[in-house]
From Swiss-Prot:
It comes from the Bacteria. SUPFAM superfamilies: DnaJ/Hsp40 cysteine-rich domain (SSF57938). The lineage of its organism: Bacteria, Bacillati, Bacillota, Bacilli, Bacillales. This is Uncharacterized protein YuiA. It comes from Bacillus subtilis (strain 168).
Length: 47
């Protein structure tokens, strides 16, 4: 039997919920999509 695990808060799809990217030449940069929060900022809100 297969089970799927889900989390209550949706992680940012661009940085995988980390809030930053590791740069190839060293260092890190804040994720421009979630502004470093690690949460998906593209969720829909009701009006």
């Amino acid at each position: 039997m297969k089970t799927a695990t889900t989390t209550a808060s949706h992680a940012c799809p661009f940085c995988s919920g980390k809030g930053y990217f590791q740069l190839i030449l060293g260092g890190s940069e804040t994720c421009p999509s979630c502004q470093g929060t690690g949460k998906d900022s593209h969720s829909f809100s009701s009006r």
